[in-house]
Amino acid sequence: MRNGTVITEFILLGFPVIQGLQTPLFIAIFLTYILTLAGNGLIIATVWAEPRLQIPMYFFLCNLSFLEIWYTTTVIPKLLGTFVVARTVICMSCCLLQAFFHFFVGTTEFLILTIMSFDRYLTICNPLHHPTIMTSKLCLQLALSSWVVGFTIVFCQTMLLIQLPFCGNNVISHFYCDVGPSLKAACIDTSILELLGVIATILVIPGSLLFNMISYIYILSAILRIPSATGHQKTFSTCASHLTVVSLLYGAVLFMYLRPTAHSSFKINKVVSVLNTILTPLLNPFIYTIRNKEVKGALRKAMTCPKTGHAK
Protein backbone atom coordinates (compact mmCIF):
# COMPACT_ATOMS: atom_id res chain seq x y z
CA MET A 1 0.00 0.00 0.00
CA ARG A 2 1.32 3.48 -0.88
CA ASN A 3 2.37 5.89 1.83
CA GLY A 4 -0.25 8.55 2.41
CA THR A 5 -3.18 6.19 1.87
CA VAL A 6 -5.26 5.66 4.99
CA ILE A 7 -5.05 2.05 6.15
CA THR A 8 -8.28 0.21 6.91
CA GLU A 9 -6.82 -3.30 7.10
CA PHE A 10 -3.57 -5.16 7.71
CA ILE A 11 -2.07 -8.13 5.88
CA LEU A 12 -0.54 -10.81 8.11
CA LEU A 13 2.42 -12.53 6.43
CA GLY A 14 2.63 -15.39 8.90
CA PHE A 15 5.57 -17.61 7.88
CA PRO A 16 6.14 -17.05 4.14
CA VAL A 17 9.44 -18.97 4.12
CA ILE A 18 7.84 -22.35 4.86
CA GLN A 19 6.20 -22.94 1.48
CA GLY A 20 5.14 -26.57 1.10
CA LEU A 21 4.80 -27.19 4.83
CA GLN A 22 1.48 -25.40 5.33
CA THR A 23 -0.64 -28.56 5.60
CA PRO A 24 1.47 -30.47 8.17
CA LEU A 25 1.97 -27.27 10.20
CA PHE A 26 -1.76 -26.54 10.12
CA ILE A 27 -2.52 -30.05 11.41
CA ALA A 28 0.20 -29.92 14.09
CA ILE A 29 -0.83 -26.50 15.41
CA PHE A 30 -4.54 -27.35 15.27
CA LEU A 31 -3.98 -30.55 17.28
CA THR A 32 -1.80 -28.61 19.73
CA TYR A 33 -4.58 -26.07 20.15
CA ILE A 34 -7.16 -28.80 20.84
CA LEU A 35 -4.85 -30.43 23.39
CA THR A 36 -4.26 -27.05 25.04
CA LEU A 37 -7.99 -26.44 25.39
CA ALA A 38 -8.57 -29.98 26.66
CA GLY A 39 -5.64 -29.98 29.10
CA ASN A 40 -6.35 -26.62 30.68
CA GLY A 41 -10.10 -27.25 30.64
CA LEU A 42 -9.53 -30.55 32.43
CA ILE A 43 -7.50 -28.78 35.12
CA ILE A 44 -10.36 -26.32 35.74
CA ALA A 45 -13.02 -29.05 35.79
CA THR A 46 -10.97 -31.28 38.10
CA VAL A 47 -10.31 -28.53 40.64
CA TRP A 48 -13.93 -27.42 40.78
CA ALA A 49 -15.21 -31.01 41.01
CA GLU A 50 -12.85 -32.12 43.79
CA PRO A 51 -13.45 -30.45 47.21
CA ARG A 52 -9.93 -31.33 48.41
CA LEU A 53 -8.44 -29.19 45.63
CA GLN A 54 -10.44 -26.07 46.46
CA ILE A 55 -7.55 -24.33 48.19
CA PRO A 56 -5.70 -21.12 47.20
CA MET A 57 -3.00 -22.84 45.11
CA TYR A 58 -5.53 -24.56 42.86
CA PHE A 59 -7.84 -21.55 42.74
CA PHE A 60 -5.01 -19.53 41.19
CA LEU A 61 -4.09 -22.48 38.97
CA CYS A 62 -7.65 -22.40 37.59
CA ASN A 63 -7.21 -18.71 36.81
CA LEU A 64 -3.94 -19.49 35.04
CA SER A 65 -5.50 -22.32 33.03
CA PHE A 66 -8.39 -20.10 31.96
CA LEU A 67 -5.93 -17.40 30.91
CA GLU A 68 -3.94 -19.95 28.89
CA ILE A 69 -7.09 -21.01 27.03
CA TRP A 70 -7.93 -17.40 26.24
CA TYR A 71 -4.30 -16.52 25.40
CA THR A 72 -4.00 -19.17 22.70
CA THR A 73 -7.49 -18.47 21.38
CA THR A 74 -6.61 -14.83 20.67
CA VAL A 75 -3.87 -15.92 18.26
CA ILE A 76 -4.10 -19.50 16.97
CA PRO A 77 -7.32 -19.25 14.88
CA LYS A 78 -5.79 -16.40 12.85
CA LEU A 79 -2.45 -18.21 12.70
CA LEU A 80 -4.18 -21.25 11.21
CA GLY A 81 -5.71 -18.92 8.63
CA THR A 82 -2.25 -17.91 7.40
CA PHE A 83 -1.65 -21.54 6.38
CA VAL A 84 -4.92 -21.79 4.46
CA VAL A 85 -4.98 -18.60 2.38
CA ALA A 86 -2.10 -16.84 0.67
CA ARG A 87 -3.21 -13.38 1.81
CA THR A 88 -4.51 -13.20 5.38
CA VAL A 89 -6.32 -9.89 5.84
CA ILE A 90 -7.50 -8.48 9.17
CA CYS A 91 -9.45 -5.25 9.54
CA MET A 92 -8.00 -2.38 11.56
CA SER A 93 -10.49 -2.67 14.43
CA CYS A 94 -10.08 -6.47 14.55
CA CYS A 95 -6.30 -6.08 14.62
CA LEU A 96 -6.41 -3.65 17.53
CA LEU A 97 -8.95 -5.84 19.34
CA GLN A 98 -6.74 -8.90 18.92
CA ALA A 99 -3.71 -6.99 20.21
CA PHE A 100 -5.71 -5.72 23.20
CA PHE A 101 -6.97 -9.14 24.32
CA HIS A 102 -3.63 -10.82 23.65
CA PHE A 103 -1.67 -8.40 25.82
CA PHE A 104 -4.44 -8.04 28.42
CA VAL A 105 -4.47 -11.79 29.02
CA GLY A 106 -0.67 -12.00 28.91
CA THR A 107 -0.27 -9.17 31.44
CA THR A 108 -2.84 -10.73 33.78
CA GLU A 109 -1.01 -14.04 33.53
CA PHE A 110 2.19 -12.48 34.88
CA LEU A 111 0.28 -11.02 37.82
CA ILE A 112 -1.41 -14.34 38.61
CA LEU A 113 1.97 -16.13 38.53
CA THR A 114 3.29 -13.53 40.98
CA ILE A 115 0.39 -14.17 43.35
CA MET A 116 1.04 -17.91 43.06
CA SER A 117 4.65 -17.29 44.12
CA PHE A 118 3.41 -15.35 47.14
CA ASP A 119 1.06 -18.21 48.00
CA ARG A 120 3.96 -20.70 47.75
CA TYR A 121 6.03 -18.42 50.00
CA LEU A 122 3.32 -18.37 52.67
CA THR A 123 2.78 -22.13 52.42
CA ILE A 124 6.45 -22.98 52.93
CA CYS A 125 7.77 -20.09 55.05
CA ASN A 126 4.68 -19.37 57.17
CA PRO A 127 2.59 -22.55 57.12
CA LEU A 128 0.80 -21.77 60.40
CA HIS A 129 -0.37 -18.35 59.23
CA HIS A 130 -1.18 -19.37 55.65
CA PRO A 131 -4.82 -20.42 56.30
CA THR A 132 -5.59 -17.19 58.17
CA ILE A 133 -3.90 -14.94 55.59
CA MET A 134 -4.94 -16.59 52.31
CA THR A 135 -8.66 -16.66 52.99
CA SER A 136 -11.19 -17.25 50.23
CA LYS A 137 -12.02 -13.54 50.28
CA LEU A 138 -8.39 -12.48 49.89
CA CYS A 139 -7.82 -15.02 47.09
CA LEU A 140 -10.80 -13.63 45.21
CA GLN A 141 -9.60 -10.05 45.77
CA LEU A 142 -6.08 -10.85 44.57
CA ALA A 143 -7.31 -12.63 41.44
CA LEU A 144 -9.79 -9.86 40.64
CA SER A 145 -7.11 -7.21 41.20
CA SER A 146 -4.83 -8.99 38.72
CA TRP A 147 -7.54 -8.96 36.06
CA VAL A 148 -8.40 -5.30 36.71
CA VAL A 149 -4.77 -4.13 36.69
CA GLY A 150 -4.01 -6.12 33.53
CA PHE A 151 -7.08 -4.68 31.82
CA THR A 152 -6.28 -1.10 32.87
CA ILE A 153 -2.64 -1.15 31.73
CA VAL A 154 -3.38 -2.60 28.30
CA PHE A 155 -6.58 -0.60 27.80
CA CYS A 156 -4.70 2.69 28.31
CA GLN A 157 -2.04 1.61 25.81
CA THR A 158 -4.69 0.55 23.30
CA MET A 159 -6.51 3.87 23.60
CA LEU A 160 -3.29 5.66 22.66
CA LEU A 161 -2.75 3.25 19.76
CA ILE A 162 -6.26 3.87 18.41
CA GLN A 163 -5.50 7.60 18.13
CA LEU A 164 -2.63 7.01 15.69
CA PRO A 165 -3.15 7.64 11.98
CA PHE A 166 -2.00 4.64 9.91
CA CYS A 167 -0.90 5.33 6.34
CA GLY A 168 2.33 3.40 5.87
CA ASN A 169 2.98 -0.16 4.78
CA ASN A 170 0.04 -2.29 5.94
CA VAL A 171 1.92 -5.60 5.74
CA ILE A 172 2.68 -7.05 9.20
CA SER A 173 5.53 -9.55 9.20
CA HIS A 174 3.94 -11.62 11.95
CA PHE A 175 1.17 -14.18 12.46
CA TYR A 176 -0.88 -11.90 14.73
CA CYS A 177 -1.30 -8.18 15.37
CA ASP A 178 1.70 -7.49 17.54
CA VAL A 179 2.06 -3.85 18.58
CA GLY A 180 5.63 -3.42 17.33
CA PRO A 181 4.99 -4.28 13.66
CA SER A 182 1.73 -2.29 13.75
CA LEU A 183 3.57 0.84 14.86
CA LYS A 184 5.70 0.71 11.72
CA ALA A 185 2.57 1.60 9.72
CA ALA A 186 1.90 4.79 11.69
CA CYS A 187 2.14 8.12 9.83
CA ILE A 188 3.68 9.98 12.76
CA ASP A 189 6.59 9.50 15.12
CA THR A 190 5.73 6.82 17.69
CA SER A 191 8.76 7.26 19.98
CA ILE A 192 6.67 8.49 22.92
CA LEU A 193 4.18 5.63 22.57
CA GLU A 194 7.07 3.17 22.34
CA LEU A 195 8.62 4.64 25.49
CA LEU A 196 5.32 4.38 27.38
CA GLY A 197 5.03 0.79 26.20
CA VAL A 198 8.53 -0.02 27.44
CA ILE A 199 7.78 1.60 30.82
CA ALA A 200 4.56 -0.41 31.18
CA THR A 201 6.42 -3.56 30.16
CA ILE A 202 9.16 -2.92 32.72
CA LEU A 203 6.59 -2.36 35.47
CA VAL A 204 4.79 -5.61 34.67
CA ILE A 205 7.49 -8.05 33.57
CA PRO A 206 10.72 -7.20 35.45
CA GLY A 207 8.61 -5.88 38.33
CA SER A 208 6.71 -9.12 38.78
CA LEU A 209 9.87 -11.14 38.04
CA LEU A 210 11.64 -9.35 40.91
CA PHE A 211 8.76 -10.23 43.24
CA ASN A 212 8.92 -13.87 42.09
CA MET A 213 12.68 -13.97 42.66
CA ILE A 214 12.37 -12.52 46.17
CA SER A 215 9.65 -15.06 47.02
CA TYR A 216 11.81 -17.95 45.82
CA ILE A 217 14.90 -16.69 47.64
CA TYR A 218 12.91 -16.93 50.88
CA ILE A 219 11.47 -20.29 49.81
CA LEU A 220 14.90 -21.77 49.02
CA SER A 221 16.29 -20.40 52.30
CA ALA A 222 13.46 -22.12 54.18
CA ILE A 223 14.02 -25.38 52.28
CA LEU A 224 17.77 -25.36 53.03
CA ARG A 225 17.00 -25.06 56.74
CA ILE A 226 15.09 -28.36 56.65
CA PRO A 227 17.44 -30.96 58.22
CA SER A 228 16.64 -34.03 56.08
CA ALA A 229 17.29 -34.54 52.36
CA THR A 230 13.85 -36.13 52.05
CA GLY A 231 12.32 -32.98 53.50
CA HIS A 232 14.25 -30.89 50.98
CA GLN A 233 12.94 -32.90 48.06
CA LYS A 234 9.35 -33.11 49.30
CA THR A 235 9.10 -29.38 50.04
CA PHE A 236 10.79 -28.27 46.83
CA SER A 237 8.55 -30.53 44.73
CA THR A 238 5.54 -28.46 45.85
CA CYS A 239 6.87 -25.38 44.03
CA ALA A 240 9.05 -26.94 41.29
CA SER A 241 6.22 -26.94 38.73
CA HIS A 242 5.43 -23.28 39.32
CA LEU A 243 9.12 -22.35 39.10
CA THR A 244 9.36 -24.20 35.76
CA VAL A 245 6.40 -22.29 34.29
CA VAL A 246 7.77 -18.97 35.57
CA SER A 247 11.15 -19.69 33.95
CA LEU A 248 9.62 -20.62 30.59
CA LEU A 249 7.27 -17.65 30.41
CA TYR A 250 9.61 -14.95 31.64
CA GLY A 251 12.50 -16.23 29.54
CA ALA A 252 10.51 -15.99 26.31
CA VAL A 253 8.79 -12.68 26.99
CA LEU A 254 11.87 -10.88 28.31
CA PHE A 255 13.63 -11.80 25.08
CA MET A 256 10.81 -10.48 22.90
CA TYR A 257 9.50 -7.33 24.49
CA LEU A 258 12.19 -5.55 26.48
CA ARG A 259 13.29 -3.62 23.38
CA PRO A 260 11.84 -0.69 21.37
CA THR A 261 9.93 -3.08 19.12
CA ALA A 262 8.95 -0.84 16.21
CA HIS A 263 12.51 -0.73 14.90
CA SER A 264 13.63 -4.27 15.68
CA SER A 265 13.86 -7.33 13.50
CA PHE A 266 10.91 -9.67 14.13
CA LYS A 267 12.20 -12.87 12.52
CA ILE A 268 13.57 -14.37 15.73
CA ASN A 269 10.67 -12.91 17.70
CA LYS A 270 8.20 -14.83 15.54
CA VAL A 271 9.84 -18.14 16.40
CA VAL A 272 9.89 -17.29 20.12
CA SER A 273 6.26 -16.10 19.86
CA VAL A 274 5.24 -19.51 18.51
CA LEU A 275 6.90 -21.23 21.47
CA ASN A 276 5.34 -18.79 23.93
CA THR A 277 1.86 -18.81 22.37
CA ILE A 278 1.52 -22.48 21.47
CA LEU A 279 3.89 -24.70 23.44
CA THR A 280 3.87 -23.05 26.87
CA PRO A 281 0.05 -23.16 27.29
CA LEU A 282 0.14 -26.79 26.11
CA LEU A 283 2.86 -27.78 28.57
CA ASN A 284 1.45 -26.01 31.63
CA PRO A 285 -1.23 -28.64 32.49
CA PHE A 286 1.39 -31.41 32.24
CA ILE A 287 3.97 -29.44 34.25
CA TYR A 288 1.49 -28.79 37.07
CA THR A 289 0.13 -32.35 37.21
CA ILE A 290 3.02 -34.66 36.36
CA ARG A 291 4.45 -34.54 39.92
CA ASN A 292 1.29 -33.47 41.72
CA LYS A 293 -0.20 -36.42 43.59
CA GLU A 294 -3.34 -34.51 44.60
CA VAL A 295 -4.30 -33.58 41.03
CA LYS A 296 -3.38 -37.01 39.66
CA GLY A 297 -5.46 -38.61 42.41
CA ALA A 298 -8.44 -36.40 41.58
CA LEU A 299 -8.12 -37.22 37.87
CA ARG A 300 -7.89 -40.93 38.65
CA LYS A 301 -10.96 -40.65 40.87
CA ALA A 302 -12.90 -38.84 38.14
CA MET A 303 -12.04 -41.55 35.61
CA THR A 304 -12.85 -44.50 37.90
CA CYS A 305 -16.07 -43.20 39.50
CA PRO A 306 -18.30 -43.82 36.45
CA LYS A 307 -16.99 -47.39 36.18
CA THR A 308 -17.69 -48.03 39.87
CA GLY A 309 -21.19 -46.66 39.55
CA HIS A 310 -21.86 -48.82 36.49
CA ALA A 311 -20.66 -51.96 38.30
CA LYS A 312 -23.14 -51.34 41.07
From Swiss-Prot:
GO molecular-function terms, A-Z: G protein-coupled receptor activity; olfactory receptor activity
Keyword Cell membrane: yes
CDD domains: 7tmA_OR6C-like
Entry-listed glycosylation sites: N3
Transmembrane feature ranges: 24-44, 53-73, 98-118, 138-158, 196-215, 236-256, 270-290
InterPro entries named in the record: GPCR_Rhodpsn (IPR000276), GPCR_Rhodpsn_7TM (IPR017452), Olfact_rcpt (IPR000725), Olfact_rcpt_6C-like (IPR047132)
Role summary: Odorant receptor.
The family this protein is said to belong to: Belongs to the G-protein coupled receptor 1 family.
Name the UniProt record assigns to this protein: Olfactory receptor 6X1
